[in-house]
A protein has these predicted regions:
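Generic detector of short alpha-helix boundary/capping microenvironments
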Residues: 6-7, 13, 61, 76, ...
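Hydrophobic/small/kink-forming positions within alpha-helical transmembrane segments
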Residues: 9, 50, 114-115, 148
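Short alpha-helical transmembrane segments in multi-pass integral membrane proteins
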Residues: 18-83, 131-186
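Small-residue-rich hydrophobic transmembrane alpha-helices
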Residues: 1-50, 87-106
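Cytoplasmic helix-loop-helix junction between adjacent transmembrane helices
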Residues: 65-66, 70-73, 77, 84-111
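Alpha-helical transmembrane segments of multi-pass membrane transporters/permeases
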Residues: 41, 96-123, 137-144
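Short, Lys/Arg-enriched charge-dense amphipathic segments
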Residues: 91-92, 110-117, 150, 186
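Alpha-helical transmembrane segments of multipass membrane proteins
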Residues: 50, 58, 92-96, 115, ...
Length: 187
């Protein structure tokens, strides 16, 4: 939930500023904004990944002191934490696709991801197709696989004609004025 709040603010900035620069036809600046969002969402996602994977027990202690629940939570977070690493990046790709008039593509990717997650949840949690029931760990694994598919689809599609993909050069560059605008929109 907390990670999603940060990601929502960053991707909202990407969407707002992105729509302005897309409307102007300024793909260069749009790429810079996309890269800013990727950097920020990547950082936020990395922080939550580290917290969940390496400090899951302490995070669970914030919510409960029941050992059984803590153990379930830790086993979930150790796997699902990796999906948190991917979520911020895939959300940036999906927002830039919407901004650049490819909303249908994002709807297809997002719907497919949800369907994959639901199907894999059923298989992994309860067992099926020769897979042993995994319970909570199965739910985490289903989420991770769905996020991997979502990110892979988003990145691969971004290289199609008329889609935007980030410039590696702009991932390392910082534009002070654009950063101010980005932060204003996000707050």
């Amino acid at each position: 939930f907390i990670q999603n709040m940060f990601l929502a603010a960053a991707t909202a900035s990407l969407g707002i500023l992105g729509a302005q620069y897309w409307g102007k036809g300024d793909k260069k600046t749009l790429d810079e904004i996309f890269c800013m969002a990727l950097r920020l969402c990547g950082l936020v996602s990395a922080i939550f990944f580290v917290g969940c994977v390496f400090f899951g027990r302490y995070l669970m202690l914030i919510f409960t002191n029941e050992e059984v629940l803590i153990n379930y939570g830790v086993s979930y977070l150790k796997i699902a934490g990796f999906s948190y690493l991917l979520t911020g990046i895939s959300q940036c790709y999906l927002v830039i696709m919407k901004t650049s008039e490819h909303a249908k593509t994002t709807a297809v990717i997002s719907s497919m991801t949800v369907c994959v997650n639901i199907i894999l949840n059923a298989i992994f949690i309860f067992g099926g197709f020769g897979i042993v029931p995994m319970g909570v760990r199965g739910a985490a694994l289903a989420t991770l696989i769905a996020r991997i598919i979502e990110l892979c689809c988003s990145v691969l599609i971004s290289y199609k004609p008329n889609y935007l993909h980030p410039s590696m050069r702009d991932l390392l560059r910082r534009n002070k004025q654009l950063s101010k605008d980005f932060w204003k929109c996000g707050l």
